[in-house]
């Protein structure tokens, strides 16, 4: 692949951060390291900060049921911008208004187009639909929309194989589907970031600490982890849980911790900047993730790269990266506490294996896969038009 100009379209963008925003940033950095140019088309938002690459902002409005998310309400001058920039690739990181906009631009200009399937939209709609429609009615409508959308792009990128399988199982016909995980930067996330003073900030020095990282929303299912902390009170009385992240369900989870009688062993740290987050991974004993919403679970790879065993739910993308008894333990809803026990008991060997897993998903290795997906998109376009 020669040097490309890639135009990325983002439904979700800074100052809001979620998995899709982080994935897009990492992929853009990986491409730039390899000599490609990346420009971004994104919804404008209050409080925007400087960004390390050119961004073309479009007028947008806030999405009332999902704080921080914005919907582009007019196409603005996006067609003029695409024609002026003459990108080689249009890559959309979203399934809503930007997917429609970027597909329209791709069809008009005959530029190869890809969509990364970052979000299980069929499940997100249960939590965030602005319409008072029952799940059994709205979920089929979402799949209908997704089938129509994803068959029109040259390549669908799935962040993990289970997501590709799930799309195919739900009757999504795609020109091509490539599995391209988002890479983890092992220079940023590393056991070298261990800092014995970090846990002192939270009064946790000298204690075993499990870490939970993610937006505090209902679909992340922190309630399962809090329930496990109650179960672990008897045989792991010193174990504490450090919860990193903010979100709309924060108050709910704090009340639940209190109701379960585990408030004294759970610390809500709020949002941590990247440097502190890397230190948190390297300084705690293990990561726990109970979300069934993950298309990849970026936090899992960040933890593994930091030499941290992971207790993860046996669902969707998580078992792709967490291997039972090797670099962590898998659990079902009712067996989270037992998985935490197993990780704590065998953490030394799991730490070594965690690092080996992370190396397979380096930014460079994943960027090569992305380049191959771009080449495939050009082939598909040439073949079908």
Predicted segments, located by residue:
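Short alpha-helical donor nucleotide-sugar binding micro-motif in glycosyltransferases
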Residues: 82, 150, 271-272, 279-284
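Carbohydrate-associated surface elements
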Residues: 162, 183
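Conserved donor-binding/catalytic core segment of Leloir-type glycosyltransferases
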Residues: 204-229
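Nucleotide-activated donor-binding/catalytic signature segment of Leloir-type glycosyltransferases, i.e.
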Residues: 252-272
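Aromatic "clamp/platform" in nucleotide-sugar-dependent glycosyltransferases that forms part
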Residues: 292
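Short hydrophobic beta-strand element within catalytic cores of glycosyltransferases
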Residues: 309-312
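Conserved acidic donor-binding segment of nucleotide-sugar-dependent glycosyltransferases
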Residues: 323-334, 342-347
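A short, well-ordered alpha-helix in the C-terminal region of glycosyltransferases
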Residues: 348-361, 372
